[in-house]
C-alpha cells in the first residue's frame, strides 16, 4: 500500500475525474466556436499564417515551419493551425471567453454520479489575481498560450468528453452518468437511469456546422486520417498533444525526455458525423502525439460501438454480471436470516 500511495506515477489517482491536464489542440474546436459566437471571426475570414505569431516582444511559433498559408476557420481545425488561435486568443476578452466556455463544463464539476470530481481550471482575471498575487494581471501573452490549450488551462478527461458531447448535441447538455441501472438486491426490482437535458446553450447552427466541418477535415486529411482509415462510419475528431513543460527554441525528442515529462496525448471524437450518437475522449498520460497514441484507441472504441455484435455481447456480459451480483446478494441475505 505504501508503495502504491507514494509512487510518482500515482496509480490510485482516478484520472478521468481527478487528473487535470492542459487540453492541447482538442481545445481548438471550442475556441473556433467561441470566435464565431463572440464575433471575433466568421467562418469565411482567413488569416495568413507565416509559421509564427508576434505580439509586442513575444514570439510564438506554429507547429509547421513556414506556416499553413491562408487559413480560414474550417481549415484551422483540420490542420490544427496554432497561429490562427494565437490571434483569436489575443483579441478575446478573457472574462467573456470564460463565460462562454463555462456552460461546456470547463472549470466546473460536471455533476457525474461518482464522488471525487475536480473542477479543473478555466482562467479569468479574478483567478489570476488570486492565484498569483505577486503578478496579478492576466497578460495578453498568457491568453495566447491559452488559445491552443496550453498555459493555465487544465481540464479533466471527463470534462473534455462532456464538452464534446455538448458540441455533438449542438449545445444541449445532458448530465453524465456512470450508473446505468440500480437494482434492489432483495427484491430484484431495478431502476434505469434516464438521462434528460440539463440545459441548452444557444448556438447558431451555422457556427456549429463550421466546427463540425473542421472536425471532419481532421479525419479526412488531418492528424486523425491514419487512425480512422477505412472506417465504416463517418466521424469528426481532433487530436491534441499537450506539453508538460515548455521548450525554448529546442526540438522535442521523446527519447531524450524522462517519461513523466513527455507530452500528453488526446483525441476527442463524435460519430456519425451527420447525427452523432456517441462522443468520447481518449487520453494517454505522457503518451506523446495524440495522432499516434490516443486516436487509435478512439478508433477501437468507435468500431466496437458501431459493430452491433460486439456491442450486444458487451451488454449481455454486463447484464449477466449484474444478475450474478444480485443473486449473490440475495443468497447472503438468506444466510443472514438463518
What are these regions (language model features)?
Residues 308-329:
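Intrinsically disordered, low-complexity mixed-charge segments
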Residues 160, 175, 290-295, 299-303:
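Short, charged, low-complexity patches
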Residues 168, 219, 299-310:
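Short amphipathic alpha-helical signal-transduction/dimerization elements
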Residues 1-26, 30-281, 323-338:
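Beta-lactam-recognizing serine transpeptidase/beta-lactamase-like catalytic domain environment
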Residues 85-87, 289-292:
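Extracytoplasmic/secreted cell-surface and envelope-processing proteins
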Residues 20, 287-288:
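Short strand->helix junction
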Residues 288-289, 307:
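Short beta-strands and strand-coil junctions in structured, solvent-facing domains, enriched
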Residues 266-268, 281-285, 297, 301:
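C-terminal soluble interaction/assembly domains
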Amino acid at each position: 500500500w505504501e508503495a502504491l500511495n507514494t509512487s510518482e506515477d500515482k496509480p490510485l489517482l482516478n484520472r478521468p475525474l481527478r487528473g487535470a491536464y492542459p487540453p492541447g489542440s482538442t481545445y481548438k474546436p471550442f475556441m473556433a466556436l467561441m470566435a464565431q459566437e463572440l464575433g471575433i471571426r466568421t467562418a469565411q475570414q482567413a488569416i495568413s499564417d507565416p509559421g509564427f505569431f508576434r505580439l509586442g516582444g513575444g514570439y510564438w511559433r506554429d507547429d509547421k515551419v513556414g506556416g499553413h498559408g491562408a487559413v480560414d476557420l474550417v481549415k484551422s481545425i483540420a490542420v490544427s493551425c496554432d497561429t490562427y488561435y494565437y490571434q483569436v486568443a489575443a483579441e478575446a476578452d478573457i472574462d467573456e471567453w470564460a463565460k462562454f466556455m463555462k456552460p461546456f463544463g470547463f472549470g466546473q464539476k460536471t455533476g457525474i454520479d461518482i464522488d471525487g470530481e475536480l473542477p479543473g481550471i478555466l482562467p479569468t482575471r479574478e483567478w489570476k489575481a488570486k492565484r498569483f498575487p505577486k503578478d496579478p494581471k492576466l497578460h495578453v501573452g498568457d491568453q495566447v498560450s491559452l488559445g491552443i490549450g496550453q498555459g493555465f488551462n487544465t481540464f479533466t478527461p471527463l470534462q473534455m468528453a462532456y464538452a464534446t458531447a455538448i458540441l455533438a448535441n449542438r449545445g444541449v447538455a445532458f448530465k453524465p452518468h456512470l450508473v446505468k441501472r440500480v437494482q434492489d438486491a432483495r427484491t430484484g426490482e431495478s431502476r434505469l437511469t434516464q438521462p434528460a437535458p440539463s440545459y441548452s446553450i444557444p448556438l447558431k447552427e451555422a457556427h456549429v456546422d463550421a466546427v463540425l466541418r473542421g472536425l471532419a477535415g481532421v479525419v479526412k486529411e488531418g492528424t486523425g486520417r491514419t487512425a480512422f482509415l477505412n472506417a465504416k462510419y463517418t466521424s469528426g475528431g481532433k487530436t491534441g498533444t499537450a506539453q508538460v513543460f515548455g521548450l525554448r527554441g529546442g526540438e522535442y525528442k521523446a527519447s531524450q525526455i524522462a517519461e513523466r515529462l513527455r507530452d500528453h496525448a488526446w483525441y476527442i471524437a463524435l460519430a456519425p458525423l451527420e447525427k452523432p450518437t456517441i462522443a468520447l475522449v481518449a487520453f494517454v498520460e505522457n503518451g506523446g502525439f495524440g495522432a499516434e497514441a490516443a486516436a487509435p484507441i478512439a478508433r477501437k472504441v468507435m468500431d466496437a460501438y458501431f459493430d452491433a455484435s460486439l456491442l450486444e455481447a458487451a451488454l449481455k456480459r454486463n447484464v449477466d454480471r449484474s444478475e450474478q451480483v444480485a443473486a449473490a446478494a440475495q443468497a447472503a441475505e438468506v444466510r443472514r436470516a438463518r
